[in-house]
Design a protein with these regions (language model features):
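Alpha-helical transmembrane segments in multi-pass membrane proteins
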Residues: 15, 19, 23, 45, ...
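Hydrophobic alpha-helical transmembrane segments
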Residues: 61-84, 96-99
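Extracytosolic (periplasmic/ER-lumenal) interhelical loops and adjacent juxtamembrane/interface segments
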Residues: 37-59
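Alpha-helical transmembrane segments of integral membrane proteins
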Residues: 3, 7-15, 67-71, 93, ...
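Structured, non-membrane catalytic/scaffold regions adjacent to prosthetic-group chemistry
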Residues: 165-515
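Membrane-helix interfacial "entry" motifs
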Residues: 4, 8, 35, 60-68, ...
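N-terminal signal-anchor transmembrane alpha helix
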Residues: 7-32
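Hydrophobic helices that insert into or interface with lipid environments
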Residues: 91-182
Length: 519
């Protein structure tokens, strides 16, 4: 009996759902988070033109990865569902094509063995094709059962893998921040960003889950004594603490992709001495467990930059999202350039031989240094204030040499020097404040930071190629006839949409203008 179009559509949707769920189930059984559809997400990120990715980040901010996941899921379900209306043979062909794409994406993942990649891809493909003959109701039942089992298996494995890590005492503990380092102003960014509110961004899809007992840190390349350290062996080495800002290169001026934390780990230079790095080596390539790589020019050491391999954040072991068990940290360098997560190996080499992920995507080969930067946290953009004395406050940073002063300007007038809280260190951000006698009307507030080696750039620029530039600027209303508001929603939404669109346009223009190197 022939199917009606709606019945055929449901049959195709059910078979596609079985295929997706079977891929997740097989991945859970094999002990990996990389299922076929997630591998496709990573392949998509690696394949799309970098300017297009930059536009997506500018427009979607934290929603870029969820948008990719939703789009891939809808595509994986929708194409077979539509193909089913053309007949069973067309449906089988669509599922086979989807399965082969997933297999190809899995095959590219360096953290998966060939056996695992083939198993996941073939299981998902076979399950989808078999789902054609189950019927819609049975397919959905099997799919939900497989997805539920995958969730249970992953949670059980996660609990078993949750091994306690006892952090060593650093050589010179920093101690608690002094009270003078924190300004008690509502709405001001915290001096130390809590781990659960620290921004998370990377090109991994999904974040790797590392088994601590099996993890090794390998130091190789141009060294006399190659090293292979367990986590316990790394923890036994002399460590230090540092308060430092970490910022994504895609962070717009005044944006959320920046945080300040207390990190603990070992100095890269100590590991290089231990391994006997060759004197002619001038570059270090860092490899992640998922195949991502980034480099550190050893010339940075002469300029006051101090790369570290860190395993603790705010006094606790790194979380999976933040790179557990070990990540690199180079205060003063943007995140993508050297601060890689889930570190697996350190390769000592010559710069002339180094082409890493970012360079292959068109980013410059030179180190991406953070510029002096300042952000206004209080008041919010679009706030409605009363006509009396207001406090303007925010945070400023200029790692690794520190902030010299912060200035505030109202309506394009003269700059006034802001009061700084006590700095935790040259690589950390510092809180600042300034009084303002607000008068009725709409006003524009701007801030800039003077670092030890220069001042924040005024000319607005896109994140590519050296990080976003320009003064952080907000506008507020001052009225005596209305109740003060933290944010005027409609105005704020319109301004936010305009800012995202402008950032995306600047990004496209920057890529056209610079004609980036491609490795």
């Amino acid at each position: 009996m022939p199917f009606s179009p709606s019945d055929a559509w449901l049959q195709g949707l059910g078979a596609a759902f079985v295929q997706l769920a079977a891929g997740e189930f097989a991945a859970a059984v094999r002990g990996t988070h990389t299922s076929p559809v997630r591998a496709l997400g990573k392949w998509l990120v690696d394949t799309l033109p970098t300017p297009l990715i930059d536009v997506a980040i500018a427009l979607l901010r934290r929603g870029d990865k969820p948008a990719i996941a939703i789009a891939l899921t809808l595509f994986s379900l929708g194409v077979p569902a539509m193909a089913a209306t053309a007949g069973t043979a067309t449906l089988v062909a669509a599922l086979l094509l989807s399965g082969l794409l997933g297999l190809y994406a899995l095959w590219r993942r360096t953290e998966l063995s060939r056996t695992t990649a083939a198993t996941l891809g073939l299981v998902a493909t076979a399950a989808g094709i078999l789902g054609v003959f189950f019927g819609a109701e049975a397919s959905f039942a099997i799919g939900f059962a497989a997805a539920g089992l995958a969730l249970v298996i992953r949670r059980v494995r996660q609990r078993r893998r949750a091994e306690p890590v006892r952090l060593p005492r650093p050589q010179a503990p920093l101690g608690s921040p002094p009270g003078s380092a924190s300004l008690e102003i509502p709405g001001l960014s915290e001096l130390i960003t809590p781990v659960d509110r620290f921004f998370v961004t990377d090109v991994t899809f999904p974040a790797p889950s590392v088994v601590l007992r099996q993890w090794r840190l390998v130091v190789r390349g141009m060294v006399e004594h190659p090293l292979s350290l367990t986590l316990d062996e790394l923890l036994s080495l002399p460590s230090r603490e540092i308060d430092a800002v970490l910022m994504c290169v895609h962070n717009p001026v005044g944006g959320p992709f920046v945080g300040n934390a207390r990190w603990q780990g070992v100095l890269l230079r100590d590991l290089l001495v231990r391994a006997g790095a060759a004197t002619e080596a001038d570059h270090v390539r860092l490899h992640s467990v998922d195949g991502f790589s980034a480099g550190i020019s050893l010339s940075l050491l002469k300029d006051g930059f101090e790369p570290m391999l860190v395993y603790a954040m705010n006094g606790t072991p790194l979380t999976r999202a933040h790179g557990a068990p070990v990540r690199a940290l180079v205060p003063g360098i943007h995140g993508y350039d050297a601060n890689i997560k889930w570190l697996a190996s350190v390769e000592v080499m010559r710069f002339s031989e180094a082409i890493d992920y970012a360079e292959r995507k068109g980013w410059p080969r030179r180190p991406s240094r953070m510029a002096p930067n300042s952000r206004i946290d209080v008041p919010n953009h679009s706030a409605l204030l009363a006509p009396d004395r207001q406090i303007v406050a925010g945070v400023a940073w200029s790692p690794p040499h520190g902030v010299a002063k912060v200035e505030l300007r109202i309506d394009g007038g003269p700059w006034q020097v802001c009061a700084l809280a006590t700095a935790l260190g040259p690589s950390a951000w510092v809180q600042w404040q300034a009084p303002w006698d607000a008068t009725p009307g709409r006003h524009t507030l701007e801030t800039r930071t003077w670092g030890r080696e220069g001042v924040q750039a005024e000319l607005a620029a896109a994140p590519y190629p050296d990080g976003a530039r320009g003064y952080h600027r907000i506008a507020v209303d001052v009225q005596s006839t209305r109740t003060p508001q933290r944010r005027q929603v409609c105005w704020w939404l319109a301004s936010d949409a305009r800012a995202r669109g402008l950032l995306a346009w600047r990004g496209i223009t920057a890529w056209r203008r610079h004609r980036p190197h491609r490795g």
